[in-house]
Regions:
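Juxtamembrane interface at the cytosolic side of transmembrane helices
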Residues: 212-239
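Structured domain cores in non-transmembrane regions
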Residues: 41-117
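Intrinsically disordered, low-complexity linkers and stems that provide flexible hinges
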Residues: 110-210, 214
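C-terminal motif of bacterial Sec signal peptides marking the signal peptidase cleavage site
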Residues: 15-18
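One face of beta-strands
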Residues: 20-40, 120
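Solvent-exposed coil/turn segments that connect beta secondary-structure elements
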Residues: 31, 41-43, 84, 152-156, ...
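Positively charged n-region of N-terminal signal peptides that target proteins for export
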Residues: 1-4
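Juxtamembrane boundary at the C-terminal end of a transmembrane helix
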Residues: 249-255
Length: 255
């Protein structure tokens, strides 16, 4: 996938007429699976280059899913690659998803019982410093270009520097066309959680059992004779203490 990304990014540097649209994106499911999306569409003048990129992408990744796309006068392809989890994706992803020395840390994971926290620290460098003439030419040729990076999350991001964020905080978008045209650097950052639903359910089940036990022994303590009631009160207090302790611990770990 890294070779594919490098080839794809060369698309931005072509000196050609016409407009085009390039989008890179990720969809991360609540189970942690990752679907990597790429879209390359352009005018008829770019058809040979787009077809060549498609062929090379398929050679580099046999699991690549390719779909033809037509949007008005623009034609091209969408590419999808699936990964079982974020860790696997981070191993194979290249380009701005990878770490670059002294620039960014790439993708980092911080594991805990109820959730894993992920830091996406991505980096993209535009063309080297350009002369005024080269900048003017690039702006003229690429004025209608769209080059975005998008991330779809199952839960709202904890923090991000995205240029666009949806109202629910789950959709993030960064615009790279300006950096591509004028040169410079773009740092893309997002922090988000992936919750362990099985562990949440297991913890909730244990808390319910402790609560039911507390209620059961509390009732028994009120209905039995004095001697038996002392034993039931002791058990009630033990289970109540465990329930409160586990609830407090869970609340602390979640926050």
């Amino acid at each position: 996938m890294k070779k594919f990304l490098i080839v794809a990014l060369s698309f931005i540097c072509l000196i050609c007429a016409g407009c085009f649209e390039v989008k890179f994106g990720l969809t991360i499911t609540d189970s942690g699976a990752v679907i990597q999306h790429s879209k390359f569409i352009g005018t008829a003048a770019l058809a040979p280059q787009i077809e060549a990129w498609k062929n090379q992408a398929e050679e580099n990744n046999p699991n690549l899913q390719v779909k033809a796309v037509v949007e008005g006068d623009l034609r091209g392809y969408k590419f999808d690659v699936s990964y079982p989890d974020v860790e696997t994706f981070s191993k194979y992803a290249g380009g701005f998803y990878a770490a670059h020395p002294e620039k960014n840390s790439g993708i980092s994971r911080y594991a805990s019982w109820f959730f894993d926290t992920y830091d996406f620290d991505l980096y993209f460098a535009g063309a080297p410093e350009l002369t005024a003439f080269e900048t003017t030419v690039n702006q003229a040729l690429l004025s209608q270009a769209v080059f975005d990076v998008e991330i779809n999350l199952p839960y709202a991001a904890d923090s991000t520097n995205a240029d666009e964020v949806s109202a629910d905080g789950k959709y993030l978008k960064w615009h790279l066309a300006h950096v591509t045209i004028n040169g410079g650097e773009k740092f893309m950052q997002a922090r988000f959680k992936l919750w362990h639903k099985d562990k949440l359910a297991a913890t909730a089940a244990v808390e319910l059992l402790l609560l039911f036990a507390t209620i059961f022994f509390a009732i028994k303590a009120h209905t039995e004779d004095f001697e038996a009631a002392k034993d039931f009160r002791f058990k009630r207090n033990v289970f109540a203490g465990l329930f409160v302790a586990l609830t407090a611990l869970a609340a602390f770990m979640i926050h």
